[in-house]
Amino acid sequence: MIVSGGEALVDLVPAESTVDLLAPRLGGGPYNVALASARLGVPTAFLSRISTDRFGDALVERLEASNVDTSLLQRGPEPTTLAVVALDENSSARYSFYTEGTADRLVTDPGPLPGHTTALSLGTLGMVLEPGASAYEAVLRRESERGVLTALDPNIRADMITDAVAYRARFASWLPYVRLLKLSMDDAEWLAEGAGVLEAAKGWLDAGVEAVVLTKGGDGLSVVTADGEVASAPTVPVDVVDTIGAGDTVQAALLAWLVQQDTQRPSDLEPADWGQALGYAARAAAITVSRSGAEPPTADELAQFL
């Protein structure tokens, strides 16, 4: 089972009609990862704290509709986090967050995850906003030490990071507990702080990460291991509606592929294996960006695509 931990929120996206300025869409990076991996046919649970308000109920209902295990969810009366989305001329999304006193940042450490957990995915605001970030950090360290395939997508929201130096140091402290690091080129450059991305990736690998997957927007994605940049996959051409949830779909698809291959160690993969994994993730992300909001594909949709 894959466990995805982190925030669940409501994206307020530009509406298609001229009557409404913004339309609500259920989302949040880790939430999207849980939906995507479950839709791809892999048993998945979501770890978070979700509001008991109407938005929160809708978030839970959508998880259940996609067969996501909700037994690790915590519920609380605090409001749901909101993210106001702006789309640029390339349909790429920028976010403004409303997080003060919201439910997801108040998650507590659930203790050891179920014994049948094989993979753990963390990232985005869940690893930034306290006190929840410390809870997720404890889960990461504990599950890594018991052999779970751990994956991190920092999904940097720079305006939510009050101390960049402290965050980069904290990020470095996670790396010995992370087997798969997936991040966009923008995030990699922000974390590298002036160094070249491949040079930074080598440092992350030296710290304990087994594979670094870099997403490059229209230029596809690639993977860097101890042997260098060993494989890549091009972007699948589609009519892009927006990019919301694209990176989350990549994260979920990579983990789903690894779990389906019964692979716990990314370092065991050959370049040809990585080519298959990256291609699978690229196809899944292409379907997501062809639809409004974060709507990742089902396994059947992916099988029929192209």
Language model features: what each stretch is:
Residues M1-V3, R62-E64, T70-S71, S92-V230, ...:
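Ribokinase/PfkB-type carbohydrate-kinase core domain
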Residues T81, T102, T124-M127, A285, ...:
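Glycine-rich phosphate/pyrophosphate-binding beta-alpha loops
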